[in-house]
Amino acid sequence: MKLTCVLIVSVLILTACQFTAAVDCHSTGYLCFWWHECCSNFCIPLQQRCF
């Protein structure tokens, strides 16, 4: 049960991380750094892309 909870929370955080990164990149283009490897890279200013 504990493992299931951890997995669910991890998926939610991962989804929120990706969604936030997409919003930040496409709406502002500012640098954005994330704790998870899926979002550990940054958005180049004004390029509106995550690398």
UniProtKB/Swiss-Prot annotation:
Q: What is known of its domains?
A: The cysteine framework is VI/VII (C-C-CC-C-C).
What name appears for this protein in its UniProt entry?
Answer: Conotoxin Cal6.32
Annotated disulfide bonds: 25-39, 32-43, 38-50
Q: What is its main location?
A: secreted
Give the Gene Ontology MF terms in alphabetical order. toxin activity
Q: Name one GO cellular component term.
A: extracellular region
Q: Which family does it belong to?
A: Belongs to the conotoxin O1 superfamily.
Write out the function statement from the record: Probable neurotoxin.
Where expressed (tissue)?
Expressed by the venom duct.
List UniProt keywords, sorted A-Z: Disulfide bond, Knottin, Neurotoxin, Secreted, Signal, Toxin
Question: Which residues belong to the signal peptide in this entry?
Answer: 1-22
Presence of the UniProt keyword Disulfide bond in the record: yes
Q: Where in the cell is it found?
A: Secreted
